[in-house]
Amino acid sequence: MYLAILALPMFGSAVAGLRGRTIGVTGAHIITTGCLMTSAALSIVAFYEVGLSGSPVSIVIGSWIDSEFMLVQWGFLFDSLTVSMLLPVLIVSSLVHLYSISYMAGDPHNQRFFSYLSMFTFFMLVLVAGDNYFIMFVGWEGIGISSYLLINFWYTRMQANKAGMKALTVNRVGDMFLSVGFFAIFWVFGNVDYASVFSVAPYINETAITIIGLLLLVGAMAKSANIPLHTWLPDAMEGPTPVSALIHAATLVTAGVYLMLRSSPIIEYGPTVLVVITWVGALTAFFAATTGLLQNDLKRVIAYSTCSQMGYLFMAVGLSQYNVALFHLVNHAFFKALLFLAAGAVIHGMADQQDLRRLGGLVNFLPFTYTAILIGSLSLMALPFMTGFYSKDLILEVALGQYEVSGTIAYWLGTISAVFTAFYSFRLVSLTFFTTPNAPKGDYLHAHEAPMIIVIPLVILSIMSIVFGYIAKDMFVGVGTDFLSTALFQHPDHITLIEAEFGLPLLMKLLPAIGSLFGAGLALYLYHVVPSITISLTNGPIGYGVYSFLNAKWYWDALYNGLIIESGLRIGLVISKVIDRGIIELTGPYGLSTVLTGAGRSVATYDTGVITSYALYIMLGLVSLIFLVFAPTNMVFNEYGLSLILVYLSALVLLPSSTRTS
């Protein structure tokens, strides 16, 4: 059963990709979606057996690398962390497959699209279920390639090409550090198997742990879009909307967080690493929340909310609250998938329009889609008793419960980010559904709700966005729960959940919720009641400066393009001119041909046609040969040998000039 969870998505991908013309579009839909739904059902059974019944499963298929100093096996581990990740990955992926049947109905390359989707899911399952870091790396690289194929699915569009290459290139930076980190683990621990590495982690030098932790962190930052390696994430919106839902909800961006969670027995012994992770997460949450305030693309607003939520997850990891991070990861998968799929329903129903400034007044035309986006936005802003509330607010509480500088700063940055998150979430709702209609009249005349095959995933995700947090809270983060005790490690000094639950002032616990309600109300007031205020705010120099800074996304793209890319191109030009076309050309092909041509002409001058010259050459050759053959070894380079060489050279020089030039 456990191997079937992994094998079924790959089987569906292979059949749809290799036999797509034989089975047709409908066949590709049935096979890939059926395989994913079967895997999702089996993952629920696995969650019950492994997670709830406490029966971890380890499966070894065979040996991969077997040498004197390294043994890497094709092994898979199903513990409570693995099955907890399988739930959002497979449930969201199966719903995305079902949703895509209608959403991609008009595309001529359905078989290829569904093959890529299933392959993406398969590699994510390999990453999650592998029992060593090398198997994880196979899945890690697999989802990277799959994301490129999906983002660049419409490869005739220049922006899609650029977005795909950008995602692949930025992630390649993280992959380089990650691969070095994995080999550092092998060098320090002598193994890459989880059980072997984690068992000796407490006895390893702290400096080595810190270096390994930072290397793993850079890899996770690229994959989970934390600053400064976040720039690929908004551009990934060039792919089809189902791809956005799959990448941003349950697969690609969660891989980096999963790496940190799985490596908790290592990074727990590196306090410097934990502080750096906390700061990276807090700054990412704040940056993405401020940048999302001014985005006008429907999908990009949700993309920046994903980036912000990844910051919250990293913040929880840096605070050593791994169970809280996992809980928010699962919650986030459901309400973020709901937001993206509902946004796709808006785009689908409004003639592919996704500019917020060209929408408005859709609440009467798309009431069900409005309800779905409203539920997702309320869960994202952590409205009390929605799914997001039970994990997002808890992250801020445990940050304040640390009673450390990094934790306190993380709390305040996270709280401010929560206000901004609520603001841009309801800015999206207001501009899309409440404001004056701004789209062409024909778009409204043809506006329509999504068909039933799209409605079903939205209904399921809406229910999960409302009730899942309440149902799973005690299991994941309840006081005294041992659900994740065998999969995650938390040092006793870092346990602050009790303090966060019972020791903090009530005002500090309610402040994020109050701020979120204020941000949501402010957005509705500014964009629905008095929209003219938003224009006047940018008239002054300060307002215009802030607007320009946030609208330029903190100038990260300009920094990379101007400082790194342009400098690299200039250095490449200099290298090309000075070395490749300069030194190498002179000493290489051009210089070698010149030297050989000159040497050939010099040798040709000795072809004089004079018999006495030839006799001299023959005599010198014979004398030299006799000397080299019969002379003792120690005499070759003594005074006799040198004398013979001088005689030989003198004979060449003293030849009559007429003989040498005739």
From Swiss-Prot:
Topology versus the membrane: Multi-pass membrane protein
GO annotation, biological process: ATP synthesis coupled electron transport; electron transport coupled proton transport
Pfam families referenced in this protein's UniProt entry, alphabetically: NADH5_C, Proton_antipo_M, Proton_antipo_N
EC number annotated for this UniProt entry: 7.1.1.2
Catalysed reactions listed for this entry: a ubiquinone + NADH + 5 H(+)(in) = a ubiquinol + NAD(+) + 4 H(+)(out)
InterPro entries hit by this protein: NADH_DH_su5_C, NADHpl_OxRdtase_5_subgr, ND/Mrp_TM, NU5C-like, Proton_antipo_N
Keywords noted in UniProt: Electron transport, Membrane, Mitochondrion, Mitochondrion inner membrane, NAD, Respiratory chain, Translocase, Transmembrane, Transmembrane helix, Transport, Ubiquinone
Segments traversing the membrane: 40-62, 77-99, 112-129, 133-155, 168-190, 200-222, 243-262, 272-294, 301-320, 325-347, 360-382, 408-430, 450-472, 510-529, 609-631, 636-658
Protein function: Core subunit of the mitochondrial membrane respiratory chain NADH dehydrogenase (Complex I) that is believed to belong to the minimal assembly required for catalysis. Complex I functions in the transfer of electrons from NADH to the respiratory chain. The immediate electron acceptor for the enzyme is believed to be ubiquinone.
Family of this protein: Belongs to the complex I subunit 5 family.
UniProt name for this protein: NADH-ubiquinone oxidoreductase chain 5
Organism: Cryptococcus neoformans var. grubii serotype A (strain H99 / ATCC 208821 / CBS 10515 / FGSC 9487) (Filobasidiella neoformans var. grubii)
